[in-house]
């Protein structure tokens, strides 16, 4: 999560030029900052995606921001799908700003409130970096110039065709004065930086960094495609490189977005945690990121290798991003830089909430951790049984029902009233109370009599009261004799 102040500060410091290539450009604060820059005589250039995958209102808003800047003197271009031919790129999905000739901002997040939340608001987990280097800036500058050439058929100048609907107005600034909630420390040490560009060299460079891993590999990504939908072959070369690393003994951790988790996501989690880890003995774990009050979902696309190399960029971990989109990123080798991102990764890795379910077994990670179950795997190692179907305490309720009713999976009698959790339903029915209330209360009908005395004790090892005492009052038990 970052603040718009991070970018606004850098925009305010521009001396000659600002070049913004972005998929979604929707931040009023950043637009106002660029308007101020134009007022100071700064040359501002934007390249935006014409066909964003979002609602019509969002597309209209993007056109509004672009039109305001165009009217103020900015050079605004759109990447389009030209008629009569295919564009070389499906989308411009970049998140990059080049300031003057010596500084680059690269991010996983768009310029919008969900990626750059105003002060006090929640947003996505994103990774961003400012790089102060004339050499690196020159490389990115040459790449940006290629996509700023409106003579190319897939680049179109802003015009009336891209105006917003009548009545659209630029929202006011948020007034936030926040700072980046993670470190804003400037790291002045030397770093090795490899600029990457999709579809040109990004896949080769990312796989190369994974193949060079020796000790550890952390991946923080919105998603990781198992199937390779574009290009040659059906299997993801990224996933193949990750598995090769695990087979070399590298400690692999994969953190994925839980917000849009689907069957493919849980299939990948099961592949890594069950097949790679349990069956093949590889030290690899996949997990879904839990949320917090400040972080709503994982929108990142990053990687850390051996605690000293970090990938920051706009490219998702799938074939479309790597082979069909225009994307920008950087692989930075510096232990002090990587440590900042590793601290963020570990925070996300360890956090739990009440909803996230990594293994898809319908038991939230937090509940499984509290009760000593496995948050990362749905099936029981060496069996075909699912963890949710087990009844470890033998009280007649499987783990799924224990969770739903508020019971404890390793305690036959959660409320200590001498009635097994699995028998509470009968007493709850008699008392006209929900079963969940009976499991949690020793006096569910609030009559001052302990439920175990009123209904009869059913916990294993105790004598169950005779339902027909008058018929059997003259009989003796083994204990009497």
Label every PLM stretch briefly:
Residues 353-481:
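Extracellular calcium-associated, cysteine-rich motifs in secreted modular proteins
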Residues 142-148, 331-356, 434-438, 451-453, ...:
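A recurrent domain-boundary module in secreted/ectodomain proteins
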